[in-house]
């Protein structure tokens, strides 16, 4: 299992970005979380197969219809201690 931390910036808060990310992550078989950050970005930490992480990254660039994504940064991270994908 691999893990990645994504930081998504743009118009990504108040547009169902976290909930939509959770739906996509669960469909891809990923675990982790999506959280709003004080600077207006959304942090996504996800763990699963490399292919699923790549698919999530591609989706993060699009997001839900009301979102306008300006940037997605990806870094490796430790596998999160969870068996689900949560928002917070």
From Swiss-Prot:
One Pfam family named in its UniProt record: Acylphosphatase
User: Which pairs of positions does the record mark as disulfide bonds?
Assistant: none
Keywords from the named record: Hydrolase
Q: Which reaction does it catalyse?
A: an acyl phosphate + H2O = a carboxylate + phosphate + H(+)
Q: Name one GO molecular function term.
A: acylphosphatase activity
* UniProt xrefs under SUPFAM superfamilies: Acylphosphatase/BLUF domain-like (SSF54975)
- List, for all copies, the residue spans of the domain called Acylphosphatase-like: 3-88
EC numbers, comma separated: 3.6.1.7
Report the active site residues: 18, 36
The similarity annotation says: Belongs to the acylphosphatase family.
**Protein name as annotated:** Acylphosphatase
* Protein species of origin: Xanthomonas euvesicatoria pv. vesicatoria (strain 85-10)
Q: Upper lineage ranks?
A: Bacteria, Pseudomonadati, Pseudomonadota, Gammaproteobacteria, Lysobacterales
């Amino acid at each position: 299992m691999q893990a990645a931390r994504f930081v998504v910036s743009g118009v990504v808060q108040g547009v169902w970005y976290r909930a939509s990310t959770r739906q996509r992550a669960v469909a891809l078989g990923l675990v982790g979380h999506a959280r709003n950050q004080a600077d207006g970005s959304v942090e996504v930490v996800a763990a699963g197969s490399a292919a699923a992480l790549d698919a999530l990254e591609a989706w993060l660039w699009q997001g839900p219809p009301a979102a306008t994504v300006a940037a997605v940064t990806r870094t490796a991270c430790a596998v999160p201690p969870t068996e689900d994908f949560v928002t917070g």
